[in-house]
A protein has these predicted regions:
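Terminal targeting/low-complexity segments that flank the catalytic cores of oxidoreductases
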Residues: 1-5
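Acidic/histidine-rich alpha-helical segments that form the ligand environment
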Residues: 6-10, 16-20, 74-112
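Short, contiguous alpha-helical
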Residues: 24-70, 99, 112-154
């Protein structure tokens, strides 16, 4: 199943990044952008939010589900001091649940609709796909941050 392969692949690539040293975690992919540390914490928190949405759609049907303010979470949950191991564990637990439900519901129930408070009507399949896309987009940002440092060293 293609979605399962994509979820596993993006998980494996992301988990390795939680082990970066403090110097690499402090790097950014551009001026004024989040550090790698913040991006990884955000990936973990977003994964928990996406997992909740998936479970709500499967269990409660069509309803409005509210967006979350990523900057408020970064401040309120103090990404600057949060342990990387905590975020890694949150990420892995949420991803395991998402993979489980994707295997059971992506094809069978992917048509189920819900309403995102900012973007409107979406489907369960859309949300599973977003998990992969969101993760991959942020891993690209992390790679850019690490590559910027490597390029500046040469």
């Amino acid at each position: 199943m293609q979605i399962i392969d994509a979820l596993n692949s993006s998980r494996d690539e992301t988990v390795a990044l939680f082990g970066l040293d403090d110097a690499d975690l402090a790097r950014t992919y551009g001026p004024g952008k989040w550090s790698v540390r913040y991006v990884l914490h955000h990936i973990a928190d977003a994964e928990t939010v996406l997992f909740e949405r998936i479970r709500r759609v499967i269990s409660e049907g069509r309803r409005v589900i509210w967006a979350f303010d990523q900057d408020a979470w970064a401040r309120g949950l103090d990404y600057s001091t949060r342990p990387m191991g905590l975020s890694r564990d949150l990420y892995l637990a949420s991803r395991a649940g998402i993979i489980h439900y994707a295997a059971r519901h992506y094809d069978h129930s992917g048509h189920l609709e819900w309403v995102h408070s900012e973007t409107g009507v979406r489907t369960l399949r859309d949300e599973f796909d977003k998990v992969v896309r969101h993760n991959e987009d942020h891993v690209k940002q992390i790679r850019m941050a690490l590559d910027r440092h490597t390029a500046s060293q040469t």
